[in-house]
Amino acid sequence: MSAVLRKPKTFKLRSLHSEKKFGVAGRSCEEVLRKGCQRLQLPIPGSRLCLYEDGTELTGDYFWSAPDNSELVLLTAGQTWQGFVSDISRFLSVFQEPHAGVIQAARQLLWDERAPLRQKLLADLLGTVSENIAAETRAEDPPWFEGLESRFRSKSGYLRYSCESRIRSYLREVTSGASLVGAEAREEYLRLVGSMQQKLQAAQYNSSYFDRGAKAGRRLCTPEGWFSCQGPFDVDDCTSRHSINPYSNRESRVLFSTWNLDHVIEKKRVVVPALAAAVHDAEGREVDWEYFYRLLFTLENLKLVHIACHKKTTHKLHCDPSRVYCTPAAPRRKRHARHRL
């Protein structure tokens, strides 16, 4: 049958260092390649298509034999792709010892009925691994620092800055909440925010959360820099087992910026308005600003969440009314003087 009369074949296409895929259809390898290059804004000369699974190059002879909805990798001149299982082998070679048994098990997974799901889970891991994972300075891993200002000399230093920037943005939102209270209460509101800012400054804006060199309990990652998604606000864990190591390579560093430090009890909808209401309704009571501080800036109310697990729906959670104000100190009992006999 003439290719012109055939129904276009559909594929899922992505570039070499991207997890994002999109659908493309065509009646020839050349048509699919042309559409893919246009979508990804890549040059057509020197580019080619390979099957994600095993690296087989998609040519005119093989085009109609490829399964529908096959996943393709678009390679430009000089790029190579040996397939998913070969990538596992490359990953394991970092440890400089043979893992033939694991490679064989990985091959079996490809034939398993759940292979697409397992491939994705393994790809999340493999895509973040680099043999420079232990490198820390700009001199040790120059590609990691591409696009960053020269003042960043270490990976940990940049990740601390990244975390601090997020926390500072939260503080700015809290400060802007002063508009929610009347003029008579605004001074008190800003005084409480000032206390929070002083505590944040003393804690370096909790920037240690992203620092793999920080002490356990002060960081969200392993000593090697691996972060795990903590799941949506309404569950205890991530069922997809999302993980990433932004210390491994530039692509993972950029991708990590899309992960969210999500407030379980929502910052803008709940916590900031509750703080404003507490100041307005204080009537002589002392607002427990440290309670609000923990909700706004600490892991008591923050979860690290992959973008796919970040639910933008209303959380329908509220602050604890019993913790909004400081508990009045109990009056000290007077001690009666002893009379000497």
Swiss-Prot record:
Upper lineage: Eukaryota, Metazoa, Chordata, Craniata, Vertebrata
Native species: Bos taurus
PROSITE patterns: CIDE_N
Matching InterPro entries: CIDE-N_dom (IPR003508), DFF40 (IPR039729), DFF40_C (IPR015311), His-Me_finger_sf (IPR044925)
Alphabetical list of SUPFAM superfamilies matching this protein: CAD & PB1 domains, His-Me finger endonucleases
The protein's assembly and partners: Heterodimer of DFFA and DFFB. Interacts with H1-1.
Entry annotated with the keyword rRNA processing: no
Keyword Nuclease: yes
Major subcellular location class: cytoplasm
Name of protein: DNA fragmentation factor subunit beta
Activity regulation field: Inhibited by DFFA (DFF45). Interacts with HIST1H1A.
GO molecular function (one): DNA endonuclease activity
Function text: Nuclease that induces DNA fragmentation and chromatin condensation during apoptosis. Degrades naked DNA and induces apoptotic morphology.
Protein's cellular compartments: Cytoplasm; Nucleus
PANTHER family: CASPASE-ACTIVATED DNASE
EC number: 3.-.-.-
SMART domains: CAD
